[in-house]
Structure formats: C-alpha cells, structure tokens
Amino acid sequence: MFRTIRKKKNEISINKSVIYLIIAIPTIVFTIWDLFCGSIQIRCNDRDFNIEAKGWNDYTGEYSQIDSISYEVNVLQNDNDHRTNGFGNLKYAMGNFNNDIFGDYIRYTHASCHSYVVMNIDGKILVVNGENDAETKEIYQRISEKVSKERK
C-alpha cells in the first residue's frame, strides 16, 4: 500500500514537472523573441512619407505639413525621456514619448543609432532614425529635399 502511495506521488510530481515545462518553455521563448522583434521602414513617396512599423502603428506624414526638419545627435540621451504609449525593446522604441526637450512627441527609432531626424509636423514633434548614422543622414537628406521641392 505504501508503495502504491509513493508511486502515485512520483507520478504526480512528474506530471507537475511536465506542466511547468509546458508553461515555462513558451514563456521563455516569447520573452526572448519579444526583446528583439519589430522593424522600422521609412519610405519616401512623391507627396508623403510612410513609416511602416512592425510592433506598433504605422505613420504617414505629408511633406507640405512639415514646418521644420533637423538632423540631431544624442538629443534623446537624457534621463527624463519616457514612453507614455507604444512599443519598446532592446532594438526599437516606437510610439508616444515625453521628455524635457520636446515635451510630448512621437518616436520611431533604432536603439543602435544615436543620431536622429527631428521634424515639427503641424505642431507635433516626430523623431526618427535609421539603423546607423549613415542611414539616418540619408533619411534626413531625402525628406529635406522633398520638403524643399514641396515649398517651391
């Protein structure tokens, strides 16, 4: 009788371990995947630009609505910058943010790059960048050229 009880306890213990593994493995995989998922693609069209963001809402801005555009370095490296709504992980920051420099603003940035294109669009600040400084400069030049043509 004691062997039967001991055997049932071992079976229950094994069943618990299997259940814990079934729960733990997907949780770990999801957590790791979530830390690195997402993407940001900026496409310049004739009259507007599109930000296609996997992990957050896409954004479309018209060149005619851009009041100012600038290329900035290390402008977001401040302790008071925080996300108020959006998506962020080890690679990307997307959504609505707030800091001492811009107040409330919209951001689509790669964590690997510390240069930014800052645009004032109808009174709202939009901050974007590429994966590196060269890609960010290219984004700035393309949008600046389109804004200049739109203003002529």
Q: Where does each model-flagged region fall?
A:
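Alpha-helical transmembrane spans
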Residues: 1-40
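Terminal and domain-flanking low-complexity segments
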Residues: 2-4, 75, 111-152
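Compositionally biased, intrinsically disordered low-complexity segments
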Residues: 5-8, 17, 69, 90, ...
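Short low-complexity stretches enriched in small and charged residues
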Residues: 17-28, 45, 73-87
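Sterically constrained small-residue positions within well-ordered secondary structures
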Residues: 33-35, 42, 109-110, 119
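Alpha-helical transmembrane signal-anchor/signal-peptide segments
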Residues: 37-51
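Motif-centric detector for short Cys/His coordination patterns
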Residues: 46, 50, 67, 71, ...
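Non-transmembrane, membrane-adjacent beta-strand/coil modules in membrane-associated proteins
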Residues: 52-63, 68-122
